[in-house]
Amino acid sequence: MSGFNPLNSPLIASSSLSLKEAYYLEKLSLKKGFKINYKLSEDSLNLLEKSDLCVLFGGFSNACLNENERWILESINQSKRPYALLRPLQDTRDLQENCLFASYEIHTEAAILALILRGILEKTSQLKGHVLEKVDVGYLSSEANMSEEELQELIALIVKAKKRALVLNREIAKHADNAFLYTLLSGLQNYLEILHIPCYDSSATTAFYDSKDQEWLLKTALKEGVLPFKSQLKSKDLELLERMGEANGSFVYVSYKSLETPKLSFSKQFKIANRIQHSKAGFQILDKTLECELEESPHLKGLIAILEGAFFDAYPYIPILSHSQGIS
């Protein structure tokens, strides 16, 4: 391990880490409270350049890109390759001609991964006898609020491509049920190369996790009581797909952008639902009350606002508990 002790210091890790390493680092990060910044390696950039298709799972809001997201979008757009963007936030600024965009319901990442894996298995004639054969596609699509047509279009793109990359953001890494997500990803990594890119500020970090440290990582995780994720899906795991949390009310999407005064950008629908009438208000988000500047944006849709200037190292969609103008 180069730098200092990662159990109480920020840490840089490569975007091309194995699923096992990323999982244990994220669990230890949550347990010990240190931040992880994933850095795009040269290998990762080469992989992206050689991919016929990139599936971007989460993030990539042009209103507030992090350094990894910016590099990836530049790489894709220079070559005009097709890519897919999957996330709950709906922002028309992010809809490019070469982009297949599909939104889904907050907290339903497991359903989306299961549907993608099942779709690939079906299209490649490998579904018969697989655990996911029993999954009700209509039910899961409905729970995730993604149409079966959008799903079929996405699966067709993936199967058609010869080299594919799946780029994981905070929606996966910081998810409360990420053990199950990593089990699903274990199946998907047979069909897509997987990269991890959550990054707040790698320039401010000196400690670097290297794959040579894997033995130390596994020992530390065991010592800290971190349970491993299952490498293969079992029938009883499908129960987890029926217990996904519901996302009711209004949410903020936490951006990486730094501002002196926090700013909340939102849709007309959000403004009406939350009875917003002024240019500033105090919002309670997790354990903080933030005095935010308010701005209606014609580009945004739905009940998810973009929060800039107040970073939470967590799953990026956070419910608004209350605000000073009487949100319920």
Question: Model-flagged regions — what are they?
Answer:
Residues 20, 25-36:
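Long, structured ligand/cofactor-binding scaffold of large enzymes
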Residues 3-5, 9, 14-17, 25-27, ...:
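A cross-kingdom feature strongest in bacterial/archaeal respiratory oxidoreductases
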Residues 37-145:
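Glycine-rich, acidic loop regions that bind phosphate or pyrophosphate groups
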